[in-house]
């Protein structure tokens, strides 16, 4: 069984899914990825994500897109079957989704923005991906390529060490 990374969220600019889809091109092809992503807030981002996913699926495989928001029991079962959680948000006041993943014993790789650093302890319960952002209210990274590369590196790091991932997941659960 391959190590599995999970993303759960709506398809919005704030959730950072387009950056994640770029980062996934850079990670080990041995990592299976599950995207539980639905409810796009605009037709434009829906199309952007659809095109990016198709390209990613063609180039690397090992990726599944569940295009609906799952009921809580199904989502919990999915989380328990994964090895790590990714939260690439560029705007996130708190990030309840990270707490939910941690409650399932998953280590979290997340953007160091908003309230996320209050939840994810870098190096203990997961990894925080540094992000310098424009101050225009959008949360857009000032250096998108660096953000994407740093995210990919953090994903590879946590997925390459199952024992560390389990330890971080346990620390987050506690």
Cite the ranges covered by each PLM segment.
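Short alpha-helical donor nucleotide-sugar binding micro-motif in glycosyltransferases
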Residues: 76-82
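Nucleotide-activated donor-binding/catalytic signature segment of Leloir-type glycosyltransferases, i.e.
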Residues: 35-37, 46-69, 73
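A structural motif in glycosyltransferase catalytic domains
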Residues: 5, 20-21, 33, 151
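Short hydrophobic beta-strand element within catalytic cores of glycosyltransferases
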Residues: 107-110, 120, 127-128
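A conserved mid-protein helix/loop that constitutes part of the nucleotide-sugar donor-binding site
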Residues: 3, 12-26
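A short, well-ordered alpha-helix in the C-terminal region of glycosyltransferases
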Residues: 150-153, 157, 164-174
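Aromatic "clamp/platform" in nucleotide-sugar-dependent glycosyltransferases that forms part
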Residues: 90
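Short glycine/serine-rich donor-binding loops of glycosyltransferases
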Residues: 95-98, 116
């Amino acid at each position: 069984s391959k190590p599995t990374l999970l993303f759960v969220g709506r398809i919005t600019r704030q959730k950072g899914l387009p950056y994640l889809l770029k980062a996934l091109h850079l990670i080990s092809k041995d990592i299976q990825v599950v995207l539980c992503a639905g409810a796009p807030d605009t037709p434009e981002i829906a199309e952007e994500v659809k095109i990016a996913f198709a390209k990613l699926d063609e180039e690397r495989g090992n990726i599944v897109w569940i295009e609906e928001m799952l009921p809580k029991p199904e989502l919990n079962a999915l989380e328990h079957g994964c090895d790590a959680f990714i939260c690439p948000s560029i705007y996130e006041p708190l990030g309840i989704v990270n707490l939910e993943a941690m409650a399932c014993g998953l280590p979290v790789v997340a953007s160091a923005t908003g309230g996320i650093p209050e939840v994810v302890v870098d190096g203990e319960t997961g990894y925080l991906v540094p992000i310098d952002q424009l101050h225009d209210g959008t949360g857009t990274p000032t250096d998108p390529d660096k953000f994407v590369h740093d995210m990919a590196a953090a994903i590879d790091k946590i997925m390459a060490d199952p024992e560390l991932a389990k330890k971080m997941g346990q620390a987050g659960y506690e």
